[in-house]
């Protein structure tokens, strides 16, 4: 399976927050094939996946597999989970935030000779970032990693950031969201 096919397969999984719905089942074998050890760290109805390879300072890719609800499907110009390619663009719920980032990082790892790695590389994914984010990465998993002397030293989050166009901005320490209604 190539990068595009994998991304489409991941996007077709209807992982509406806080449910993973099988995304980790798709991702985990790919990581194991690269030599990563993996661990599911679940709290209540939230699934989390932690994978690592190597030793030393820990560089972690942080992400989430959940997506926000689609809203009325008839408001979409296409099926939000079809992940169809039109004019070289994959359109699907989660394409920008953030299943494509997960695919890109995973496939970048396939191009690295991990046997020459001098640090620990880890991946930490949660199924509950778009919702209340309880029982996921920040609230529980990072605490568990610290308690096991497995702190993260460096982190890359594949969250989209932008001012004018998707991906035109890199941000440091951004977390959270705001939702509301105007009446």
Which role fits each region the language model picked out?
Residues 1, 42, 161-165, 172, ...:
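Metal-dependent amide/peptide-bond hydrolase catalytic core
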Residues 1-91, 114-118:
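Acidic/His- and Gly-rich active-site-bordering loop/insert found
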Residues 16-18, 90, 97, 129-132:
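Glycine-/small-residue-rich active-site loops that bind phosphorylated ligands and cofactors
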Residues 50, 122, 179-183:
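Beta-strand secondary-structure signal
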Residues 78, 151, 175-179:
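Short, solvent-exposed loop/turn segments at the edges of secondary structure
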Residues 88-104:
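Glycine/serine-rich anion-binding loops at beta->alpha junctions
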Residues 99-173:
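Acidic/histidine-rich catalytic neighborhood of metal-dependent amide-processing enzymes
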């Amino acid at each position: 399976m190539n990068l595009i096919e994998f991304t489409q397969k991941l996007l077709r999984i209807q992982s509406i927050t806080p449910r993973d719905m099988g995304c980790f089942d798709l991702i985990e074998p790919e990581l194991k094939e690269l030599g990563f050890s993996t661990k599911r760290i679940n709290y209540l109805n939230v699934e989390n996946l932690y994978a690592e390879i190597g030793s030393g300072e820990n560089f972690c890719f942080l992400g989430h597999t959940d997506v926000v609800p689609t809203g009325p499907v008839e408001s979409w110009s296409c099926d939000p989970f079809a992940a169809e390619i039109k004019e070289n663009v994959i359109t699907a719920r989660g394409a920008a935030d953030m299943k494509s980032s997960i695919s890109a990082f995973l496939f970048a790892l396939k191009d690295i000779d991990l046997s020459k790695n001098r640090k620990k590389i880890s991946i930490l994914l949660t199924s509950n970032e778009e919702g209340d984010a309880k029982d996921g990465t920040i609230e529980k998993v990072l605490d568990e990693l610290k308690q096991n002397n497995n702190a993260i030293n460096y982190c890359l989050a594949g969250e989209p950031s932008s001012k004018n166009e998707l991906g035109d901005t890199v941000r440091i320490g951004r977390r959270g969201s705001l939702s509301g209604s105007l009446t």
